[in-house]
């Protein structure tokens, strides 16, 4: 074949090859552009979701709860032990929506603090060896089901700056009770959490309350002794934190332990021996969570309080009748630490002093003397 005949064929093949390369390049470019658009849309969705939930909480809880005030040593009802009170408690305190395919945000913590909540429950995970707050509906240490997380350092900073300030909390001198449920076995994360707590030494309880208060029941201490302080409670469902001595210095109490129980609401509602639970809660404490699920209803505070349970953890983003009743209960009490009724508090059994003996009835040796004799009988 002549050279002149080959050139058109070669040119055609070259053109086809170039077209294929251009087509592949366009496909790759289009795919990259599609991914970028998806990422931008995802970021916009998350931003709008966070903004929507924060706006919702702000609309409901934007102002300070004027019905709640700080405990005071001038009120005799504030002079009892910690376990003799109901605590106003928020469940998953950084959550403003459901626990799956949703977001967490620090704005939700600020909102519940404005309402006077002093019991704060968190679910803590490990990301890049750092403790973070998120939520999930599965009992798995490797899965969080929220799109984002909140660093625990931001949680502590918010507690320091908002929980103890009169402009952001109506009861700013009341103690804060932090309850943590760990979803990790990462010891490096636990060490980093200990380092974080160390930077808040002045806010936390002293060394006499380290290592679970050295086996003593912190609930048996006077409520007023914890004013302006943070009490740390870890849940023993995951005991990995017990291996970290540095962190144990900051653990004042544990739930699912001898001094404190943890229940889902179902287990309180269907408890076969409520009288035993009432007796237990007279000297110890219990925390009650909503039942499992991505968007559960709140516990019935009336039933849980009747069982003597001190911390009935509420979902403040779920405005149902149970939340409204719980809010009304603490508003009427005017404290976030509301004294339990007398029949649900421990009263030690005392034995009255013995009647003094009549010396005339004594069997001791005595002397009998007359003008005629003297002898001992």
Where are these regions (language model features)?
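Long, acidic (Asp/Glu-rich), low-complexity accessory segments flanking structured domains
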Residues: 2-119, 126-205, 209-377
């Amino acid at each position: 074949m002549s050279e002149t005949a080959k050139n058109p064929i070669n040119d055609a093949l070259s053109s086809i090859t170039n077209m294929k390369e251009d087509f592949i390049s366009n496909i790759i470019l289009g795919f990259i552009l599609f991914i970028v658009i998806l990422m931008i849309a995802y970021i916009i969705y998350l931003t709008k979701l966070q903004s929507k939930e924060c706006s919702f909480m702000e609309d409901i809880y934007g102002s300070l709860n004027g019905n709640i005030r700080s405990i005071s040593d001038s009120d005799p009802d504030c002079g009892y032990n910690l376990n003799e009170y109901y605590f106003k408690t928020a469940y998953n305190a950084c959550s403003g929506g459901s626990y799956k395919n949703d977001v967490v945000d620090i704005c939700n913590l600020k909102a519940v603090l404005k309402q006077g909540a002093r019991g704060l429950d968190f679910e803590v995970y490990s990301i890049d060896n750092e403790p973070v707050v998120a939520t999930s509906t599965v009992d798995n240490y490797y899965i969080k089901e929220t799109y984002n997380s909140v660093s625990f350092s931001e949680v502590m900073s918010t507690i320091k700056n908002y929980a103890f300030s009169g402009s952001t909390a109506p009861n700013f001198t009341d103690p804060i009770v932090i309850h943590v449920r760990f979803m990790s076995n990462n010891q490096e994360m636990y060490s980093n959490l200990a380092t974080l707590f160390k930077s808040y030494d002045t806010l936390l309880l002293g060394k006499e309350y380290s290592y679970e208060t050295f086996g003593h029941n912190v609930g048996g201490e006077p409520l007023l002794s914890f004013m302006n302080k943070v009490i740390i409670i870890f849940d023993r469902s995951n005991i990995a934190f017990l291996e970290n001595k540095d962190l144990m210095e900051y653990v004042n109490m544990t739930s699912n332990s001898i001094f404190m129980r943890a229940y889902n609401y179902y287990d309180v509602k269907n408890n076969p021996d409520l009288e035993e639970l009432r007796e237990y809660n007279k000297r110890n404490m219990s925390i009650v969570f909503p039942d499992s699920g991505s968007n559960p209803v709140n516990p019935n505070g009336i039933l849980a309080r009747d069982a003597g349970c001190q911390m009935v953890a509420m979902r403040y983003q779920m405005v149902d009748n149970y939340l409204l009743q719980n809010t009304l209960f603490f508003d009427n009490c005017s404290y976030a630490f509301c004294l339990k009724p007398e029949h649900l508090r421990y009263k030690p059994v005392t034995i009255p002093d013995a009647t003094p003996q009549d010396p005339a009835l004594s069997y001791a040796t005595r002397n009998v003397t007359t003008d005629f004799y003297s002898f001992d009988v």
